[in-house]
């Protein structure tokens, strides 16, 4: 009985973290299913209003992703920059925030602030307030300097070793997209 209870508890914890990093439902371009290098979909205010109108949907938020690298003097690491906008629900990240704060993410300007996991910060010898250089390969290499505003720790290594959170605006600019273009929409039910 104890073993079954432990397995059920572990399964529930993993499920909650996967949903916390993503959502119950993601609407995205079909070409993006197996890659973090995504093709945009157009999501305007009318679509956000329509999706929010379903009684089963408790929250809707847009997101965009951009794979890249973090580089310090001593190391480099692959990562995915996930941009979220003002409708971002910070409750999941707030639960796992160990240092700093969650910035007020925007879709119309970049704060150049980022949330990074404790695992990545430790691996890269980074701390709260540090400036980090991130690099993105497209037709040419593009670099951005970001400031670590917060450090989170979920102990879910598949995500902790990969994701940095920042403004939707910054990620869309890196992707060369228009304001209504995003990687997808996340729905909580």
Model-derived features with residue positions:
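Short, strongly hydrophobic transmembrane alpha-helices
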Residues: 1-9
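Membrane-interface junction motifs in transport/secretion proteins
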Residues: 11-44
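A short beta-strand structural signal in non-transmembrane regions
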Residues: 25, 120-121, 180-189
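Conserved residues at the C-terminal ends of beta-strands
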Residues: 28, 63-66, 188
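Structural beta->alpha junctions
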Residues: 31-37, 153-155, 187-189
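A structural signal for hydrophobic secondary-structure junctions
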Residues: 41-180
């Amino acid at each position: 009985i104890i073993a079954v209870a432990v397995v059920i508890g572990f399964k529930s914890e993993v499920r909650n973290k996967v949903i916390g990093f993503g959502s119950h439902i993601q609407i995205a371009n079909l070409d993006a299913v197996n890659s973090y290098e995504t093709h945009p979909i157009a999501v305007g205010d009318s679509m956000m209003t329509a999706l929010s109108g379903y009684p089963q949907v408790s929250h809707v938020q847009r997101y965009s992703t951009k794979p890249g690298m973090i580089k310090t003097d001593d190391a480099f690491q692959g990562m995915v920059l996930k941009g979220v906008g003002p409708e971002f629900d910070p409750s999941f990240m707030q639960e796992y925030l160990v240092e700093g704060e969650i910035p007020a993410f925007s879709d119309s300007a970049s704060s150049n602030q980022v949330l990074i996991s404790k695992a990545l910060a430790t691996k890269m010898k980074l701390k709260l307030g540090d400036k980090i250089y991130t690099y993105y390969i497209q037709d040419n290499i593009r670099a951005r300097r970001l400031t670590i505003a917060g450090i989170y720790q979920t102990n879910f290594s598949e995500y902790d070793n990969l994701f940095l959170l920042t403004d939707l605006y910054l990620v869309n600019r890196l992707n060369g997209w228009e304001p209504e273009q995003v990687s997808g929409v996340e729905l909580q039910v």
